[in-house]
């Protein structure tokens, strides 16, 4: 008889190699065919709900790793909540309006000048819907589960109607108004931008110091004195109407070689250095407070215009001269302080950034090119004291990457000032995973200006505003709701297809239009108003969802974006935050922490990861990141992730192979009758389960990633499964010792598969399909393991044993190196107490020590002679085992015997083989 035939070797069809790129789509097809998304909802119908509201990605372009990070994190959460019994619908969404789609069509050769606005918008819509289908396919390929057959899309008529109603309610409360104010203006996009559409890059700019002569000294300063201003935007000097000083700062009149200059005293040294003044020739003649300088009149350096000295609290001594060049048409602080003094708002720049006729001799010049012309003129007039160039952080258009300017134009605004405190209060009542998240959005709301909600484009939701013949604005509850009803029925394109009178309620009249003629607003809404209306357009509209959402989760850039616009519109109309809990993640960088770019050749995209390695590798990578900060990805990092995956897969496969002949309904051993080592592992499983559930609850996936590896590698592979081979393969099939271990092994396999399911969605499903006797058709329709109290005394006892076992392994390794033994089964271990640990007493309660240490013989004595090696948990001696090697189990025994014709079997193997012969 071949002894191998008598061994109970592992058997499973679960393959060693994952083959994920080919296998995952098959698993997904099965899920789709079974409509698993709705099955999971049906299972938990009537239970407590959990609503994670999806922030809509922009419907343009291929997915990047940031998209993958975001959607996979959301999927972890929703799948976990579902397995915890929550009714957790997930409705993905898309943001579809805005400039990038207009630009994409232009790149494709669509000439908008050859078609009507309505026709061009139709093409934009078609393009957006095509992009959604492509992105949808890629999101699903990542294993993300949701209602992809019925997502929310910001261009859908019912969504646009909800957005218009929010606008109307805000208008009713006096929160929407029109004004000429300086706003971020992008000449490259020919449109105003919100703060969320601004990003900062380094820019080289002119740095100039300019002298303004005093025209009317008001009896305060010397008539021949000059104010010095500093600016990095020479092109705004033609729009100067004032010089702002801080009322509480000290200012000095300095005589420098006969010239009298007024600057802040705190900046005098810095100015002297910048202007190369000889400090020995500088004399402080007079001192004033900024308040005393108020209403002194200076003369514009080259225009026939006065420049009034005014007070403003925004003036600092961080840089410059303490005398701030003020052009209300080109700066927010300038505008605000200018309103107080009723200063004119001059902004002689057109949509393209070119000087208009109002710009006089600069007419026709691009603003940036005008910098040189202005400095040349200042030099000619003797007003330019210094020209230099500096590189500084400057606002750019987030789409075109070109610099932006502040420009006063007629715009529509949503008032932040009127609801700011309410929003801040709502933030205080919102939960955050990390305090800095709360601080970040709180400070952004606290410090932000009014929200420019108008855009001078065509692909977006129109502002539902009409104008009477006399120019009066018509924006009533009646007219706005009528437009909302029209949009709900026909979509917003109707605004561009019908005349104004046909968009107003039937029979509508207005005293400002005696002839019954009306015009309509041509601007559209900021796309952040679109996505920021999703709490109404989605949460309050879809029957399976509810308001407010339990959670919003997006990239950290959304503190100024979607998080901000959503809470603004929600607080303004509903009085509460649209989210109860806010969580954010960082950006995806390359392996060295650098930004990914095609030029650096360091770009990794989801499609590439999925095709080469599989979605489960991408998902495992997400779980391995500290996602609250920026995360890293590279081929090397993905290789490490794949290695971890392989270990997880092989451990699960080993367990599957060893429970192939086990039926939990008939073969399970009651817990009270389990071997103590098995009870220890059962309690370790419970401990691991409690920790994993806690980590899921706290969104700590990195902890799960690390603890899974620790449990699988240290507890299972390095100990329990290694120890178990001598039992699972060698003992009789139905023996108590084998069934005891299989009982626990089965529990570990089932619970581990469930705990891994939200992360390794495909692999967990594959394991489940190979696990015998499971009740649910899919692991994703099963419940998470329950948290059970652990036997702490048992855990403490066995932790001490595991430490002692580590000492034995160290001793075995030394003996191996000294050629005393080869494999550990060739060893006889003698353990004794020492000064550090009473090993002999401790080990009295342990059975089958030779199996636990994976050696042939173990002897425990009170004391050993000086030849023993002292370890932390006892003195240990390793010798070669006594007797001969059993040809079946490879343990050494002095009692080898025969069964019929079979020789060289230890007593245990003799007994097992007898039962088979």
UniProtKB/Swiss-Prot annotation:
Assigned keywords, A-Z: Aminoacyl-tRNA synthetase, ATP-binding, Cytoplasm, Ligase, Metal-binding, Nucleotide-binding, Protein biosynthesis, Zinc
Residue numbers covered by motif 'HIGH' region: 57-67
Keyword Cytoplasm tagged: yes
Compartment list: Cytoplasm
Positions bound to Zn(2+): 886, 889, 906, 909
A GO cellular component entry from the record: cytosol
Residues that bind ATP: 598
GO biological process: isoleucyl-tRNA aminoacylation
Required cofactor names: Zn(2+)
Catalysed conversion reaction: tRNA(Ile) + L-isoleucine + ATP = L-isoleucyl-tRNA(Ile) + AMP + diphosphate
Pfam families: Anticodon_1, tRNA-synt_1, zf-FPG_IleRS
One Gene Ontology MF term: isoleucine-tRNA ligase activity
Enzyme class: ligase
Domain of life: Bacteria
EC numbers on record: 6.1.1.5
Cofactor: binding comment: Binds 1 zinc ion per subunit.
Residues binding L-isoleucyl-5'-AMP, per UniProt: 554
PROSITE patterns reported for this sequence: AA_TRNA_LIGASE_I (PS00178)
UniProt cross-references to InterPro entries, sorted A to Z: aa-tRNA-synth_I_CS, aa-tRNA-synth_Ia, Anticodon_Ile_BEm, Ile-tRNA-ligase, Ile-tRNA-ligase_type1, Ile-tRNA_ligase, M/V/L/I-tRNA-synth_anticd-bd, Rossmann-like_a/b/a_fold
Role according to the record: Catalyzes the attachment of isoleucine to tRNA(Ile). As IleRS can inadvertently accommodate and process structurally similar amino acids such as valine, to avoid such errors it has two additional distinct tRNA(Ile)-dependent editing activities. One activity is designated as 'pretransfer' editing and involves the hydrolysis of activated Val-AMP. The other activity is designated 'posttransfer' editing and involves deacylation of mischarged Val-tRNA(Ile).
Family the entry assigns: Belongs to the class-I aminoacyl-tRNA synthetase family. IleS type 1 subfamily.
Self-association state and partner proteins as the record states: Monomer.
Domain notes: IleRS has two distinct active sites: one for aminoacylation and one for editing. The misactivated valine is translocated from the active site to the editing site, which sterically excludes the correctly activated isoleucine. The single editing site contains two valyl binding pockets, one specific for each substrate (Val-AMP or Val-tRNA(Ile)).
NCBIfam families, per database record: ileS
Protein name (record): Isoleucine--tRNA ligase
Organism placement in taxonomy: Bacteria, Bacillati, Bacillota, Bacilli, Bacillales
């Amino acid at each position: 008889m071949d002894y191998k035939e008598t061994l109970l070797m592992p058997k499973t069809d679960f393959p060693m190699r994952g083959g994920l790129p080919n296998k995952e789509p098959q698993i997904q097809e099965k899920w789709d065919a079974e409509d698993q998304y709705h099955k999971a909802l049906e299972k938990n119908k009537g239970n407590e709900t959990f609503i994670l509201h999806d922030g809509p990605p922009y419907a343009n372009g291929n997915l990047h790793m940031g998209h993958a990070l975001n959607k996979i994190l959301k999927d972890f959460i929703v799948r976990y909540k579902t397995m915890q019994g929550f009714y957790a619908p997930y409705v993905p969404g898309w943001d579809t309006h805005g400039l990038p789609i207009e630009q994409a069509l232009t790149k494709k050769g669509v000439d908008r000048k050859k078609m009507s606005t309505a026709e061009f918008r139709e093409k934009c819509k078609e393009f957006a819907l095509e992009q959604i289908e492509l992105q949808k396919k890629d999101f699903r390929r990542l294993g993300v589960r949701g209602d992809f057959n019925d997502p929310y899309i910001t261009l859908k008529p019912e969504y646009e109607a909800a957005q218009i109603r929010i606008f109307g309610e805000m208008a009713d409360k006096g929160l929407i108004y029109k004004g000429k104010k300086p706003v971020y203006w992008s000449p490259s996009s020919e449109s105003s931008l919100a703060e969320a559409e601004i990003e900062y890059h380094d820019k080289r700019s002119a740095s100039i110091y300019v002298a303004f002569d005093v025209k009317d000294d008001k009896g305060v300063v010397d008539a021949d004195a000059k104010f010095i201003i500093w600016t990095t935007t020479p092109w705004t000097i033609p729009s100067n109407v004032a010089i702002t000083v801080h009322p509480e700062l000290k200012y000095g009149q300095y005589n420098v070689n006969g010239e009298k200059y007024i600057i802040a005293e705190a900046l005098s040294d810095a100015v002297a250095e910048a202007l190369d003044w000889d400090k020995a020739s500088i004399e402080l003649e007079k001192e004033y407070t900024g308040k005393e300088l108020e209403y002194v009149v200076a003369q514009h350096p080259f225009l026939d215009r006065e420049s009034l000295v005014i007070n403003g609290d925004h003036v600092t001594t961080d840089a410059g001269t303490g005398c701030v060049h003020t052009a209300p048409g080109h700066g927010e602080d300038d505008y605000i302080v200018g309103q107080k003094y009723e200063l004119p708002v001059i902004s002689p720049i057109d949509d393209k950034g070119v000087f208009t006729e109002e710009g006089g001799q600069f007419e026709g010049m691009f603003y940036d090119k005008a910098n040189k012309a202005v400095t040349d003129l200042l030099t000619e007039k003797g007003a330019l004291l210094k020209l230099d160039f500096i590189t500084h952080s400057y606002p750019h258009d987030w789409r075109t990457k070109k610099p932006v300017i502040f420009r006063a134009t007629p715009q529509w605004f949503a008032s932040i000032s009127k609801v700011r405190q309410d929003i801040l209060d709502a933030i205080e009542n919102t939960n955050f995973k990390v305090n800095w998240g709360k601080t970040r959005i709180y400070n952004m709301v606290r410090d932000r200006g009014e929200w420019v909600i108008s855009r001078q484009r065509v692909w977006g939701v129109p502002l539902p505003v009409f104008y009477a013949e006399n120019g009066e604005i018509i924006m009533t509850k009646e007219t706005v709701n009528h437009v909302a009803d029209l949009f709900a029925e026909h979509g917003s394109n109707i605004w561009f297809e019908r005349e104004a009178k046909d968009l107003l309620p039937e029979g509508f009249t207005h005293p400002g239009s005696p002839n019954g003629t009306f015009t309509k607003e041509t601007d559209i809404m900021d796309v952040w108003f679109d996505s920021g209306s999703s709490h109404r357009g989605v949460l309050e509209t879809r029957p399976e969802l509810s308001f407010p959402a339990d959670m919003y989760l997006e990239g950290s850039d959304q503190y100024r974006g979607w998080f901000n616009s959503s809470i603004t519109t929600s607080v303004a109309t509903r009085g509460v935050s649209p989210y109860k809990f806010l969580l954010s993640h960082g950006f995806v960088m390359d392996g060295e922490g650098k930004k990914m770019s095609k030029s650096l050749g360091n770009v990794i995209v989801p499609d590439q990861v999925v095709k080469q390695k599989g979605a489960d590798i991408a998902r495992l990578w997400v779980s391995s990141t500290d996602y609250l900060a920026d995360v890293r990805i590279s081929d090397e990092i993905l290789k490490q992730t794949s290695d971890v995956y392989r270990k997880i897969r092989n451990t699960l496969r080993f367990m599957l192979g060893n429970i192939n002949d086990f039926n939990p309904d008939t073969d399970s051993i009651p817990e009270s009758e389990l071997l103590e080592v098995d009870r220890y592992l059962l309690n370790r499983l419970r401990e691991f389960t409690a920790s994993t559930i806690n980590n899921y609850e706290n969104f700590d996936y990195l902890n799960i990633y690390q603890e899974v590896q620790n449990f699988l590698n240290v507890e299972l592979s390095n100990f329990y499964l290694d120890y178990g081979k001598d039992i699972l393969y060698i003992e009789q099939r139905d023996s108590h010792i084998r069934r005891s271990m299989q009982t626990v092994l089965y529990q570990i396999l089932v619970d581990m598969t469930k705990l891994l399911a939200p992360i390794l969605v495909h692999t967990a499903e594959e394991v489940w399909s190979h696990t015998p006797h499971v009740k649910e058709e899919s692991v994703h329709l099963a419940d998470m393991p329950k948290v059970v109290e652990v036997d702490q005394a048992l855990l403490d006892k066995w932790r001490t044993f595991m430490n002692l076992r580590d000492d034995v392994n160290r001793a075995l390794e030394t003996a191996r190196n000294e050629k005393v033994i080869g494999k550990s089964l060739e060893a006889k271990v003698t353990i004794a107490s020492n000064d550090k640990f009473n090993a002999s007493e401790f080990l009295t309660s342990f059975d089958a020590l030779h199996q636990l240490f994976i050696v042939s013989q173990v002897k425990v004595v009170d004391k050993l002679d000086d030849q023993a090696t002292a370890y932390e948990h006892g003195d240990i001696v390793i010798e070669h085992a006594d007797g001969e090697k059993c040809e079946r189990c490879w343990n050494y025994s002095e009692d080898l015997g025969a069964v019929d014709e079979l020789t060289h079997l230890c007593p245990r193997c003799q007994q097992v083989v007898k039962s088979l012969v």
